[in-house]
A protein has these predicted regions:
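Short beta-strand-turn/beta-hairpin segments enriched in glycine/proline and small hydrophobics
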Residues: 146-162, 177-201, 222-223
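Hydrophobic membrane-insertion alpha-helices, especially the h-region
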Residues: 6-26
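Amphipathic alpha-helical scaffolding segments comprising HEAT/armadillo-like alpha-solenoid repeats
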Residues: 2-3, 28-42, 64-80, 100-113, ...
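Residue-level detector of extended alpha-helical repeat arrays and alpha-solenoid scaffolds
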Residues: 51, 88, 120-121, 230, ...
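Short inter-helical turns and helix N-cap capping residues of alpha-solenoid HEAT/ARM repeat scaffolds
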Residues: 46-47, 83-84, 115-116, 226, ...
Length: 282
């Protein structure tokens, strides 16, 4: 092997190792950012993941009582209306880390009307940590929190032919592909539409089959919420839940291999706290 060939071989091997590392390094939200880079990332609208990275770093600083995090609070309020769903979702979580943040309470209340199921849910979870005008826990987002315990029905965005579907029982991330739909057009020239899950969880039911023709608004699938989502909802309902929420909570109290112990235990705690509050009322 010549020296030139050997060098090319080692260079190729080095790149095979380096490029995945660089990709991981640039997308890993745990990488610490200096203050100046956080400021730059928050304004990088061309790279939403940069904004998310900065938001996660700010959230961690708030949790560690780092007073320097307050310099970015106006940015957190601004990002509540960012066009990218993932940014708004992360932002809603971060604002819940400081209930004294100027403008946070008002921004989160507005986010309860967001077009995204997950953004509404995260805003509601954060609001449960705030106090309302009477000094009680803010229960404004309670309906959205209860909704986090319910399956989500995925609908066809338009008429067309189903060309592919995921399998029942498959775990799926938020944004994961549930089915593909070939739009019903005279020419058939439009590309297939990827129908994605609005939440992370598990596919409970596929309501159609490959090759079937569906109308706009037809149900494609039902997604059961993920364990983490349910657990967080139970924690919030422990604080603000009411007696009418118990029917949504109690299915998670049963012993089942599909329900992790931590979720079941949190459901039981929420149930107990709700009944205790109800019995204390005059």
């Amino acid at each position: 092997m010549s020296t030139r060939t050997r060098l090319l071989f080692y260079l190729t091997a080095w790149l095979i190792v380096l490029l995945p590392f660089l990709f991981w390094w640039n997308t890993w939200f745990g990488r610490q950012l200096p203050d100046q880079q956080i400021t730059e990332y928050l304004r990088d609208d061309k790279r939403p993941r940069h904004i998310q990275h900065a938001l996660v770093q700010i959230g961690e600083r708030i949790m560690h009582h780092d007073l320097r995090a307050a310099q970015w609070y106006p940015e957190l309020v601004r990002l509540a209306t960012h066009p990218v769903e993932e940014v708004r979702n992360t932002d809603a979580w971060v604002m819940g880390q400081d209930t004294a943040g100027p403008g946070f309470h008002e921004a989160l209340l507005k986010m309860l009307q967001d077009s995204s199921t997950m953004v509404r849910g995260n805003a509601a979870l954060s609001l449960a940590l705030f106090r309302d005008a009477s000094g009680s826990r803010d229960a404004s987002g309670r309906p959205q929190i209860v909704a986090l315990l319910q399956p989500v029905h995925v609908l066809a965005p338009g008429a067309g032919r189903v060309t592919d579907t995921a399998r029942v029982g498959t775990a799926i991330h938020q944004g994961g592909i549930v089915a593909k739909l070939q739009p019903a057009t005279p020419s058939g020239a439009l590309a297939a539409i990827e129908i994605r899950s609005p939440i992370s969880g598990r596919i409970h039911l596929i309501s159609t089959s490959t090759g079937a023709t569906v109308a706009a608004g037809a149900e494609i699938a039902t997604i059961d919420p993920g364990d983490e989502q349910v657990w967080e909802a139970m924690r919030a309902l422990y604080l603000i839940g009411r007696a009418e929420d118990l029917p949504a909570i109690r299915p998670y109290e049963r012993e089942s291999r599909d329900i992790p112990d931590r979720v079941r235990e949190q459901a039981l705690l929420a149930d107990q706290a709700i009944r205790s509050r109800a019995s204390a009322q005059p």
